[in-house]
């Protein structure tokens, strides 16, 4: 298995697909990386030379924010909103939907399992 950006990527898959296993790299960025490095799109990971793997690794390190750095930045952005006390920050703090979705019904994923209300009958 090739190790890129701290992630073991599967060797049997095509390079474009395997790169999407890295947090922060989707199909679009994976295609971009392969084109920058100059690897054919149908090439599989186990067919890559060490030099090509190194080129991919350097391209990702230089041009993209992935894995831990990306997760850290996302967490810091959410923390900043919460510290500001803005509406979006309050919604994050309360564990409710942030982007204007309805909460009277639905939103169970964000709110967690339904809580029983004492004295309420069907």
From Swiss-Prot:
Give the taxonomic lineage as stored in the record.
Bacteria, Pseudomonadati, Pseudomonadota, Alphaproteobacteria, Hyphomicrobiales
Q: Where are the transmembrane segments?
A: none
User: What family is this?
Assistant: Belongs to the universal ribosomal protein uS13 family.
What cellular component GO annotations does this protein have? cytosol; small ribosomal subunit
GO terms, molecular function: rRNA binding; structural constituent of ribosome; tRNA binding
tRNA-binding as UniProt keyword: yes
This protein's species is Rhizobium etli (strain ATCC 51251 / DSM 11541 / JCM 21823 / NBRC 15573 / CFN 42)
Put simply, this protein is called: Small ribosomal subunit protein uS13
Q: Which GO terms describe its biological process?
A: translation
What is the role of this chain?
Located at the top of the head of the 30S subunit, it contacts several helices of the 16S rRNA. In the 70S ribosome it contacts the 23S rRNA (bridge B1a) and protein L5 of the 50S subunit (bridge B1b), connecting the 2 subunits; these bridges are implicated in subunit movement. Contacts the tRNAs in the A and P-sites.
What the entry lists under InterPro entries is as follows: Rbsml_uS13_C, Ribosomal_uS13, Ribosomal_uS13-like_H2TH, Ribosomal_uS13_bac-type, Ribosomal_uS13_CS
Q: Which gene holds the coding sequence for this protein?
A: rpsM
Output the HAMAP family linked to this UniProt entry.
Answer: Ribosomal_uS13
Under NCBIfam families, the record lists: uS13_bact (TIGR03631)
Q: Where is this region: Disordered?
A: 99-122
Q: How does it assemble?
A: Part of the 30S ribosomal subunit. Forms a loose heterodimer with protein S19. Forms two bridges to the 50S subunit in the 70S ribosome.
> Sorted alphabetically, which SUPFAM superfamilies does this protein's record hold?
S13-like H2TH domain
* Protein keywords: Ribonucleoprotein, Ribosomal protein, RNA-binding, rRNA-binding, tRNA-binding
């Amino acid at each position: 298995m090739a190790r890129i950006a701290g992630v073991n990527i599967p060797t049997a898959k095509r390079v474009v697909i395997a790169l999407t296993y890295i947090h922060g790299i989707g199909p679009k960025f994976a295609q971009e990386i392969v084109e920058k490095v100059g690897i054919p799109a149908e090439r599989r990971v186990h067919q890559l030379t060490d030099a090509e793997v190194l080129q991919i690794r350097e391209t990702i390190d230089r041009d993209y924010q992935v894995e831990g750095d990306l997760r850290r930045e996302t967490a810091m952005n959410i923390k900043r909103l919460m510290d500001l006390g803005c509406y979006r920050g309050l919604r994050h703090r309360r564990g409710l939907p942030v982007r204007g979705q309805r909460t009277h019904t639905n939103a169970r994923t964000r709110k967690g399992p339904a809580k029983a209300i004492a004295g309420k009958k069907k």
